[in-house]
Amino acid sequence: MIVPAEAPRAKLDRIEALGAELVPVTHEEWWQAMVDRGRQGVEGFFVHPVADEPVMAGNGTIGLELAEDAPEFDTVVIPWGGGGLTTGIASALKALRPDVRVVTAEPETGAPLAAAFEAGEPGEIRFEPSWVDGAGGRALLPGMWEHARELVDEAVAVPLAEVEEAVRLLAARAHVVAEGAGALAVAAALRREDRCVCIVSGGNIDLPVYAGIVSPAAAA
């Protein structure tokens, strides 16, 4: 499995525990592998983590569950990493509940979708890696802008301080351990006044990073 070398150790350890052989590369090389749908010297069948249709269809079951089990909401807020999660959820949900607004959340250190909506077209932006490693980037992956224009109503860039506050809120009130990308949706929803469903998409965060965020000193 091709992975960014700077990914949280907690995430990499769990992948290895499932028997995978890791091929760590720089963030730039990892991104290029997704653009090229493979990497020279790495053999095997390439499953795209974002733009693979069965993966997106699997994500769509979340949208089906929301429509069936949580009917009283106005907006779904989804973290935007590469776009596969949003595309899947929004495709299913819009088919059943076209009135629901789809809002994506990205870290302001790298929010290519928010920038694309503002500019009216996708382009490369300045990207600063951060502890919110599961979202954010310098550009949209090929094909994702077309999906986003059709399915997304609003794209929000969230300051890291607000993401940290969302991590603390999830820990204190919901007893949920969320990584940065997972807490993005909650951080974006806290700005809103409508009824929101937040997709807290992951809890793979290294313990020292998490402890530094939820400690009383960090919250002061």
Positions of PLM-derived features:
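PLP-dependent amino-acid enzyme catalytic core
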Residues: 1-220
